[in-house]
Amino acid sequence: WRSSPRILVEEFAQGPQYCAAIMGNEVVCISALDFAPPPYFVYLGGTYPAPLTEDEHRCIADVSLSCLRALGLGWGPTNVELRWTKRGPVVIEVNPRLGGSVQTIEAAYGIDLVTEHIKLVIGEEWNLHKRHSHIATARLLIPDRDGILDWVDGDSRAAAIPGVVEAKLYVKPKTPIVRKGDYRDYIGYVLAASPSRARTKAIVQRAVDSIRWSITPFPMEQEQLATSHVSAPAQVPSGEG
């Protein structure tokens, strides 16, 4: 059985992206999401809470809850992703599950959404009370090229930095690195939290800078690179020579 080829064209929503983490009908928090540039838009991490005005927060919360009502998703954990465009919030996706940033939420507010979800499932009363209010940021690490990972280190140095909640590597030396333009490209992450947005940003950057690696291009890429260097004509500045 063969189907005729079809193309799906979707509008690109220009603007910062946010994610509302929800339990039942309560918006727990809203994060600001970071993505790599086109064409893949690989997710790079997020910050809780997002730097929003009261009106922006209220608008995103209202739109998110209206999505749940429209879809009949009033029970358990959900997360709604939106982009804030010139005409206001545009919904990107609605997910009837816990989001992937439960650790970041716990670092920011002291709320363990996994535990609270289990309480809901077994019939106990959940508790979404915020035990503290910090700025928490997660940053995912992505390699800059394909090839064989020669070495990678610095996770212990990063983890020892005050304010770093966790620093973890997913790969080991001699691992083949082939970027696919999605979540499978991640080789590690760092998570940090502090009472200050500027301080958290500085801690995360220091932790990321502490983690280093070396990747040797695959043999074919090495040959192509050498050939391109040999065949490239020398450029003579205008007016000289």
Regions found by a protein language model. Name each.
Residues 1-7, 11-50, 58-90, 95-102, ...:
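Phosphate-binding core of ATP-grasp and ATP-grasp-like enzymes
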Residues 38-42, 101-105, 160-162, 212-215:
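A short, polar/proline- and glycine-enriched secondary-structure boundary/capping micro-motif
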Residues 52, 105-109, 192-195, 199:
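Short alpha-helix boundary/capping segments
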Residues 56, 74, 105-110, 131:
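Alpha-helix N-cap/loop-to-helix boundary motif
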Residues 59-62, 112-113, 134:
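Generic recognition of short, well-ordered alpha-helical interface segments
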Residues 103-119:
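Gly/Ser/Thr-rich active-site loops/lids in small-molecule metabolic enzymes
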Residues 118-241:
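Peripheral (often C-terminal) accessory segments that flank ATP-dependent C-N-forming ligase machineries
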